[in-house]
Amino acid sequence: MKPTVVSADVLFEDHRATLKWEWVAGLGASERRFDEVAVSEARSGADLVGYLNYIHPYRVQILGEREVAYLSHVGPEDSARRISRIITLEPPVLVVADGQTAPDTLLSMCERAQLPMFATPESAAFVIDVLRAYLSRHFAERTSMHGVFMDILGMGVMITGESGLGKSELGLELISRGHGLVADDAIDLFRINQTAIEGRCPDLLQNLLEVRGIGLLDIKAIFGETAVRRKMRLKMIVHLVRRETLERDYERIPYEPLTQDVLGVPVRKVIIQVEAGRNIAVLVEAAVRNAILQLRGINTYQEFVERHRRAMEQDD
């Protein structure tokens, strides 16, 4: 599920420093929000901000140099008609960018209609980039999953499995081997675009890892700044299972790579059996290295199948 609400005052305050903007009209409409239907139907935050567009009134409408010229470099009646059309469509916010001065007619109509309008010296393209990234994060589909989320060799890896299999201990060993912790226990996952899932740690659990028998460990304080990450893209799920579960539910060597659906995005999945004497940390590292090879187009299993086929043909 994704949130469907962000108000004009929150949008303004969150970017006051970055965009150096001022609230020039419609200050009484600080609670004005995006149309909830438009938000729920938007494929990403990119659909919710753009240059002046009469066809998509639900967007944050950005007025750069050309848009301001379109509104002002005509006769008074035409200018008033064009501006009135914008006001009638009731966009959530208007932003005058490129250091442009808003026409007096636009200011007065926004004030009369209580339509929030911001003015910034930053370029229109920069404003659009910043707001698209912000709205993509804010309105992203989201969920929470149980496990340990790690940065292993630059790849975001989520370790899952039933309780008592040693996920946190595995995470601790991987940290001691130079990898980074993103989140332990609860992982907040966001679909930031159609093909990417981003994982973060809830603020309450930031930098913390719980190990049975020891308690809570502050990984940043113990191992240093480089041992923690603020967020990572989810690229792989390592699922820990007991031996009987592995033999019952999974093939030993699957012909097709396993995947797990997370917020509508298929994520590569690897099953690792937990058993006394097995070095799970090394196995996880090997699985990640193998996945990196596959991303480069090197598939060891397919190469083995091809080698086996050629050997059989030679025997015949």
UniProtKB/Swiss-Prot annotation:
The gene is hprK. HAMAP family: HPr_kinase. It comes from Polaromonas naphthalenivorans (strain CJ2). Both phosphorylation and phosphorolysis are carried out by the same active site and suggest a common mechanism for both reactions. ATP binds at G161, E162, S163, G164, L165, G166, K167, S168. Its EC number is 2.7.11.-, 2.7.4.-. Homohexamer. Mg(2+) binds at S168, E210. The active site is at H146, K167, D185 (proton acceptor), R252. Residues 209-218 are annotated as: Important for the catalytic mechanism of both phosphorylation and dephosphorylation. The keyword ATP-binding applies. The Walker A ATP-binding motif also binds Pi and PPi. This is HPr kinase/phosphorylase. Belongs to the HPrK/P family. GO terms for biological process: regulation of carbohydrate metabolic process. It comes from the Bacteria. NCBIfam families: hpr-ser. One of its GO terms (molecular function) is phosphorelay sensor kinase activity. It catalyses: [HPr protein]-L-serine + ATP = [HPr protein]-O-phospho-L-serine + ADP + H(+); [HPr protein]-O-phospho-L-serine + phosphate + H(+) = [HPr protein]-L-serine + diphosphate. Residues 273-278 are annotated as: Important for the catalytic mechanism of dephosphorylation. Catalyzes the ATP- as well as the pyrophosphate-dependent phosphorylation of a specific serine residue in HPr, a phosphocarrier protein of the phosphoenolpyruvate-dependent sugar phosphotransferase system (PTS). HprK/P also catalyzes the pyrophosphate-producing, inorganic phosphate-dependent dephosphorylation (phosphorolysis) of seryl-phosphorylated HPr (P-Ser-HPr). Its cofactor is Mg(2+). InterPro entries: HPr(Ser)_kin/Pase (IPR003755), Hpr_kin/Pase_C (IPR011104), Hpr_kin/Pase_Hpr_N (IPR011126), P-loop_NTPase (IPR027417), Ser_kin/Pase_Hpr-like_N_sf (IPR028979). Keywords: ATP-binding, Kinase, Magnesium, Metal-binding, Multifunctional enzyme, Nucleotide-binding, Serine/threonine-protein kinase, Transferase.
